[in-house]
Amino acid sequence: MDFISIIQSAPPIILKKLEDLKGLRERPDYHPEPSTFHHIEIVTNRLIPTENMDLILAGVLHDICKLDCVRVNPKNGHPTSPGHDVAAFNLITETPEIQNWIKGMGADLIKVAHICLGHMRFHQLGQMREFKREKQIQDWKDQGIWDALAIHGAADNMIEEFDLNNLEKSWKWKRS
């Protein structure tokens, strides 16, 4: 299994969005890769060795709506895509073709959607007060997605080297 074979089975709406993301260059200090498409490919390839289809498809879909939400940050001139996590969640939960693809690939639709929804909040855990952070982590544990988010969050960080055996090293935040 590789990224290309996974996306070749995706519905046309996903293929179109992926193609369009080849033209979106993100903030280079967080995303040194050439485009959002390449970022998605890297994240997905990092997740394939887990053999967890929930994670693998979340890798494909987590940034799928970045172009839909993009705007220029007036402070630094870099593109930003606020709300792309919510937009991806909505796209997944409201599009039968995507739902059928996820299920057909052997993944859990609800888990994939919630990993996509939580992926930005995961990166912000280090900015939260300890009580709020631990409550959020417990909520994700209750949803059955904490372990997957911990892996996805490490795979999604382009600044640190990804190490499946040492996830916290790759997180954008450090546990106190």
Language-model segments: which ranges?
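Short intrinsically disordered terminal tails
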Residues: 1, 175-176
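Acidic/His-rich, divalent-metal-binding segments that scaffold phosphate/diphosphate chemistry
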Residues: 1-73, 77-79
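Alpha-helical structural motif
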Residues: 2-6, 10-17, 36-39, 84, ...
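Divalent metal-dependent catalytic cores for phosphoryl transfer on phosphate-bearing substrates
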Residues: 46-165
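Long, amphipathic alpha-helical surface segments
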Residues: 161-162, 166-175
